[in-house]
Amino acid sequence: VSAREDGVIELRSEGFEPDIVRVGDGAAYPRFSSASLISGIAEQIAERGYTVGGFDAYTVSSVYKGSGLSSSAAFEDAVGLIINDMFCDGALSPLELAIISQRAERDYFGKACGLMDQAVCAVGGLVSLDFADENDPKVTQLCPNLDGLGLCMCITNTGGSHADLGDEYSAIPAEMRSVAEYFGQRVLRGLTAEQIISELPALRAEVGDRAVLRALHFVRENERVARVCRALAESDTDAFLGAIAESGRSSAELLQNVTVPGSSREQGVTLALALSGELLRGVRSAYRVHGGGFAGTVQAFMPPEAVESYCRGMDAVFGEGACRLTSVRGEGACRLV
């Protein structure tokens, strides 16, 4: 990264055409473009009273694009960090940068998204997020990595992409919201599975079965989050794996985000989950869909001695290098030098 005096941000990413943005020109950059993200981040930081200048930057990434590995959030947080470091003396907190990144993706890029990906990338480590107050979410770093559990995490890219699945992804919160509205609420938080089950006949008629199933997933998933947090705090490997396995089954059966409706020829995520079950049979492990689902990646947790054979088996089906042993970095978006 290097500064420039003409108020232009030129960002070149390996393998992509350069993005050129003139700071403060008020231009509307094409939606779904990296330039729109850069412009949105710079504009929001300027609105907070900082003088944002130009710079040149070159980025290299090994994150699979559109695979559910938060590639857009990583890009956004990197741009925000550069501007924060160069023009704000580091005054913006990781959470502030995450909120700026989310709004850039939602309002400038044009894709509906939550705050989870941006917050985790900005903060680093294993993180819990509480959105009771959407304007002031609580972010807690639980631990820096998985070392305390004696587990490794492998991510397998099944070859599908999230890039054209916006409608499927957006339907999930919309359907959950329809259940919340039935109970006179804006969101599902605070409802119990028992409340939903007690109203099943009426709910089925009003919102449909899939919406009900997704709502049940939501309320139980929040319970599992609390269990995972306790397991990490207590280094309880069995409790952690149990909750992850339950979450994976619930995603497939209730949330229904492992296949694209109507797609019978390509079901990469479902196949990867089934293959994981075969490869990890008898191994202390857990696996589930990763990211927004429908396509992209799966995650699997296992002891170190199981990694080599697991990756070999997954690569044999999804291609050389599809399965990667990954680590959780304790530090989020940061300046290295």
Language-model features, listed with the residues they occupy:
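C-terminal nucleotide
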Residues: 2-36, 44, 128-288, 300-337
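Short, internal active-site loops enriched in acidic
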Residues: 60-66, 103-106, 196-197, 293, ...
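Alpha-helix capping and helix-loop boundary segments enriched in small/acidic/polar residues
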Residues: 29-32, 66-74, 92-95, 106-110, ...
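Short, hydrophobic/aliphatic alpha-helical segments
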Residues: 52-63, 98-107, 249, 268-286
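Short, solvent-exposed positions on alpha-helices
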Residues: 53, 95, 117, 238-242
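N-terminal pre-core extensions flanking Radical SAM catalytic domains
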Residues: 292-298
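Fold-level recognition of mixed alpha/beta catalytic cores in primary-metabolism enzymes, strongest
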Residues: 67-155, 337
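Anion-binding (especially nucleotide phosphate/pyrophosphate-binding) glycine-rich loop
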Residues: 1-100, 280
